[in-house]
Each structure stands twice: as C-alpha cells, then as structure tokens.
C-alpha cells in the first residue's frame, strides 16, 4: 500500500466534477486508470433509464487462480461540487490513549469534498494496484462503478434489472 499514491489519486478524483446524472468525466478517468491496470472496461446501457450521461462502468481482470472477487462504489457526488478545492491540514487526532498530528483532507471553500465515494474508489484502486504489483495469485476481479447512487441508487437499480 502506497499512502502517497492513494492521496494523489484521491486528490485527482475530487477535482473532477461528477454530480448525479453528470458522471461521464469521472467514469472516463476511472476507465483509464483501470485500463492501465490491465482491466477490460465496458459500460452498460443504463444511461437510457437513469438519465445519466454515462452508463455504469464494469471492469474485469482475469485471475491467476480459481475464484472471483468484486468491488463496487459509485461515481456521483452530491452538490455543490463545482470548483472543489481540496486542502491538506495538520490536525490533532486524539483517542483515549494517544494524540498525534495527522494530515486531514478537507474542502477549502463552500463545496463538499466529494469524499463520498471518491475516497472509496481511491482505496479500491490502491488495493488493486498493490495486489497487481505484488504478483500474488489472484482470482478474477470485477469492479462495478455505478451512476446516480445519490439519487435512490438509480444506476444500481438499472443494472439489477439488466441482470
């Protein structure tokens, strides 16, 4: 696991506007990153049903051992998400036993940070990169990134109807 790479990936993602129904730029970014990792990327036809400007992203990578595993997250964020400026602040993090300084990523302005669900996607991508770089045996891997989750799971619902 490379913490610097996770942070870099997350900061790249939060700079991409992706409100519900307008996830295409985020989908294109994710498709490119998954393709770089060797995944075959497709999009379903759910946009016709959800009204989004893209379908759900479905990516597959053949495994080296039997079995399969899946990861899922969503591409959209709530508003306001235009012009997000992420900043890294040093803050004291305290629990019952220890206090320490930690870096915290937050929004600099009047927008949300878009951590929901871009932090999840960054974590999935870093986990995938780490496994692939290790050369460890792995089962087939599927990644599903849905649209319009913030709108009553429209993308996931459209996918389920196609299944």
Where are these regions (language model features)?
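Catalytic-core environment of secreted peptidases
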Residues: 60-115
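N-terminal capping segment at the start of a domain
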Residues: 1-21
